[in-house]
Swiss-Prot record:
InterPro entries: Ribosomal_uL4, Ribosomal_uL4_dom_sf, Ribosomal_uL4_euk/arc_CS, Ribosomal_uL4_euk/arch, Ribosomall_uL4-arc. One of its GO terms (molecular function) is structural constituent of ribosome. It comes from Saccharolobus islandicus (strain M.14.25 / Kamchatka #1) (Sulfolobus islandicus). Part of the 50S ribosomal subunit. The gene is rpl4. One of its GO terms (cellular component) is ribosome. HAMAP family: Ribosomal_uL4_A. This is Large ribosomal subunit protein uL4. One of the primary rRNA binding proteins, this protein initially binds near the 5'-end of the 23S rRNA. It is important during the early stages of 50S assembly. It makes multiple contacts with different domains of the 23S rRNA in the assembled 50S subunit and ribosome. Forms part of the polypeptide exit tunnel. Keywords: Ribonucleoprotein, Ribosomal protein, RNA-binding, rRNA-binding. Disulfide bonds: none annotated.
Amino acid sequence: MYLELVKKNSVILDKDGNKVKEVELPFIFSFPVRKDIIRRVFLAEFTHSLQPKGRDPMAGKRTSAESFGINLGMARVPRVKNSGEAALAPNTVGGRLTFPPSVDKKLVEEVNDKEKQLAVISALSATADTVFVKARGHVFKDSVSFPIVVTDDIVSLKTASEVEEFLEKIGVYDDVKRVKERIRIRAGKGKMRGRKYKEPIGPLIIVHDSNSPIVKAARNIAGVDVVNAKDVSVIHLAPGAHPGRLTIYTETSIKILDERLSKRLVS
């Protein structure tokens, strides 16, 4: 299939939200948004986080229960000696499972590398479209244009308050407020299992250096994630397989993404 892609332009902002210059974006931000590919790859990558589980092979079988036999006017289920309590059988209290979960079950779903790369390109393209960003429920000022590209010096921000101030100046801090207001206690047993709160998804900051101070500075801000451009995937760009996450790019991260993914596209 032949696609004629047209390059977009974007304004680069500094830490104070002022326009510094205008640059031409690579073709990866002009690719059509393929929700079907994004969903398929998201679900495949999600399976990599699943943990195999099984049961003790002897679970429900640690009993001396045997059937009393026939012609006694009672069911022939295994019964505990000197007690008469039914045991061992799947339909009894404390009995074995008929088909227990197995650690041999194949949990990880495979997906083609080319398809995975196209999904990332498509998800990146959605972050450059205001319609998709709004459809995800993100909140931002009307003056914000997408994609949001900022100068590389933002990676030197060292405290959470500095990062929050930066987000306020570029017009996306309202999205952090939305996340804070909507954090709630999870329904169900997950509360007992280390998953007490459900937190909405907020802004994503894509940087060019994993060791930069902003990585630690932003990790305690509700809903905000910081990811290296070399590692960014559909999991980050389209949480829940819904494309259009509010994303902030550093100038160098755009170049890294272009080098990493543009070979999949023919200009």
